Amino acid sequence: MSLVYMNIMIAFLTSLLGLLMYRSHLMSSLLCLEGMMLSLFILSTIMILNIHFTLASMIPIILLVFAACEAAIGLSLLVMVSNTYGVDYVQNLNLLQC
């Protein structure tokens, strides 16, 4: 495994660890999700370029489309929660609260 692959995997694992550790605020969770998507995009692009698999060249672009949709929905949810409750705690998203 080359050093580039290891660095990208470490970036993905760091973002995953951040998502698991700092899940009290919605903004921290969204930033960690964006880091995970960015590292997945870079990893898939490099792997497709290295193995010369031209049929799968659309996969990174599709991944970017899903990342953009995820970011838009996450930011709209963040604005809605911040306007409603005044803070961006994830515990405010529980729909089972009375």
UniProtKB/Swiss-Prot annotation:
The lineage of its organism: Eukaryota, Metazoa, Chordata, Craniata, Vertebrata. It is a multi-pass membrane protein. The gene is MT-ND4L. This is NADH-ubiquinone oxidoreductase chain 4L. Core subunit of respiratory chain NADH dehydrogenase (Complex I) which is composed of 45 different subunits. GO terms for biological process: ATP synthesis coupled electron transport. It catalyses: a ubiquinone + NADH + 5 H(+)(in) = a ubiquinol + NAD(+) + 4 H(+)(out). GO terms for molecular function: NADH dehydrogenase (ubiquinone) activity. The chain crosses the membrane at residues 1-21, 29-49, 61-81. GO terms for cellular component: mitochondrial inner membrane; respiratory chain complex I. Core subunit of the mitochondrial membrane respiratory chain NADH dehydrogenase (Complex I) which catalyzes electron transfer from NADH through the respiratory chain, using ubiquinone as an electron acceptor. Part of the enzyme membrane arm which is embedded in the lipid bilayer and involved in proton translocation. Its EC number is 7.1.1.2. Signal peptide: none annotated. It is an enzyme of class 7 (translocase). InterPro entries: NADH_UbQ_OxRdtase_chain4L/K, NUOK/Mnh_C1-like. Keywords: Electron transport, Membrane, Mitochondrion, Mitochondrion inner membrane, NAD, Respiratory chain, Translocase, Transmembrane, Transmembrane helix, Transport, Ubiquinone. It is found in: Mitochondrion inner membrane. Belongs to the complex I subunit 4L family.
